Amino acid sequence: MSDVYADWESVIGLEVHVELNTKSKLFSCARNRFGDEPNTNISPVCTGMPGSLPVLNKEAVRKAVLFGCAVEGEVALLSRFDRKSYFYPDSPRNFQITQFEHPIVRGGHIKAIVHGEERHFELAQAHIEDDAGMLKHFGEFAGVDYNRAGVPLIEIVSKPCMFCADDAVAYATALVSLLDYIGISDCNMEEGSVRFDVNISVRPKGSEELRNKVEIKNMNSFAFMAQALEAERCRQIDAYLDNPNADPKTVIPGATYRWDPEKKKTVLMRLKERAEDYKYFIEPDLPVLQLTEAYIDEIRHTLPELPFNKYQRYLHEYALAEDIAAILISDKHSAHFFELAAQECKNYRALSNWLTVEFAGRCKLKGKNLAFSGILPSSVAQLVNFIDQGVITGKIAKDIADMMMESPEKSPETILKENPEMLPMTDESALVAIISEVITANPQSVVDYKSGKTKALGFLVGQIMKRTQGKAPPNRVNELLLVELSK
């Protein structure tokens, strides 16, 4: 990156739209379900029929309150709905019902790890609103699918407290993990259950000025988010450098962009609207939403262990490396799998490495999640225990892991019974003979080792393991090799 760019910093905030996994929509009894035939999950309310009146979904409120408790925000005892007016084909009423002035949650924070450092990203608010429909384009015309119209959302608005793409991705990743843990959304980003609008401005380092921001709409990939933020950061810096004497407000006007992943650039959609352009006013067909402290406390007590708390526990209780703990807690199903396996295997570090490296790699190739692969946590625990007990070598364990992926119902013990030829080499006289052959075949390595080049020992061990097809116990190979070399 140019040194000129290094003199600037980004100021980033995120608005995240999260579809709540209720059975019905926010203000009607129409089904809330993705993937059905277009315009089958609709009602007079979500299609804006005259005379239809909204009725608030109680479960959506409960899920919004649960989120507020999870982020340690202030859940409002009194909140209110407003109309946000805009005209677009996917909005049949020509307004959205949202919470403009009195949101259900204010404040709170998302805990994340950025480059090994604990960070608390502050939230401004979270409010309840309904989603719009979807435009589907077919060549020269477009159709409107209102199945999504009226689906309950919470919009989570952060403060402008992030200063680089890594901050934003860490925040977004931690937020999705939190949503998954508390179970208020299916968090399927490919289906649009979580959509990120990213706001970014730039300023010279050391400045406290907040310049005009640009919004990049509907990011549904962490990788695209990082790319878009870096591209937009460079675009804005270039614009300011090209116009050093101009008023910053005229150099970068407030606008909405989208990310073009093929061209690797942000593309202008429209100039930014002002709040007054939406003509907000109180929703006349819904009463004030009134909650009680007892109701909020009841919901707070249903919170599970949250990902960041679990992360800290894994560091202390299991003594895991920070990066391994972060991988395990990122998905609640993977964390649960690890904890079940850890009940039967006390070599937690080896167990976690097998889960996050060996089995994770195999599952990725097959497009599976280990937690749903059919492999039992006890089977993975048994595999690691067998290595520690010297029943099998690491090479044999990898072969068994391959077989477990193909036959997930089989434990390592069962696989070894069915394939006794996989058992490690136990005939020490045969092993000593192989060691002698390797020593004879590699005289230079022997000379190197005896002259103090310790890497030569590793080479000799590798040759022995190759000759035994990985079936010789590595520790015993080392011991016997040293004995033979000392002769």
Swiss-Prot record:
Its EC number is 6.3.5.-. Pfam families: GatB_N, GatB_Yqey. Keywords: ATP-binding, Ligase, Nucleotide-binding, Protein biosynthesis. One of its GO terms (biological process) is translation. It catalyses: L-glutamyl-tRNA(Gln) + L-glutamine + ATP + H2O = L-glutaminyl-tRNA(Gln) + L-glutamate + ADP + phosphate + H(+); L-aspartyl-tRNA(Asn) + L-glutamine + ATP + H2O = L-asparaginyl-tRNA(Asn) + L-glutamate + ADP + phosphate + 2 H(+). InterPro entries: Asn/Gln-tRNA_amidoTrfase_suB/E, Asn/Gln-tRNA_Trfase_suB/E_cat, Asn/Gln_amidotransferase, Asn/Gln_tRNA_amidoTrase-B-like, GatB, GatB_C_1, GatB_Yqey_C_2, Gln-tRNA_amidoTrfase_suB_CS. The keyword Repressor does not apply. One of its GO terms (molecular function) is glutaminyl-tRNA synthase (glutamine-hydrolyzing) activity. Disulfide bonds: none annotated. Signal peptide: none annotated. Coiled coil: none annotated. SUPFAM superfamilies: GatB/YqeY motif, Glutamine synthetase/guanido kinase. PROSITE patterns: GATB (PS01234). The keyword Nucleotide-binding applies. Heterotrimer of A, B and C subunits. NCBIfam families: gatB, PRK05477.1-2, PRK05477.1-4. Belongs to the GatB/GatE family. GatB subfamily. Allows the formation of correctly charged Asn-tRNA(Asn) or Gln-tRNA(Gln) through the transamidation of misacylated Asp-tRNA(Asn) or Glu-tRNA(Gln) in organisms which lack either or both of asparaginyl-tRNA or glutaminyl-tRNA synthetases. The reaction takes place in the presence of glutamine and ATP through an activated phospho-Asp-tRNA(Asn) or phospho-Glu-tRNA(Gln). This is Aspartyl/glutamyl-tRNA(Asn/Gln) amidotransferase subunit B.
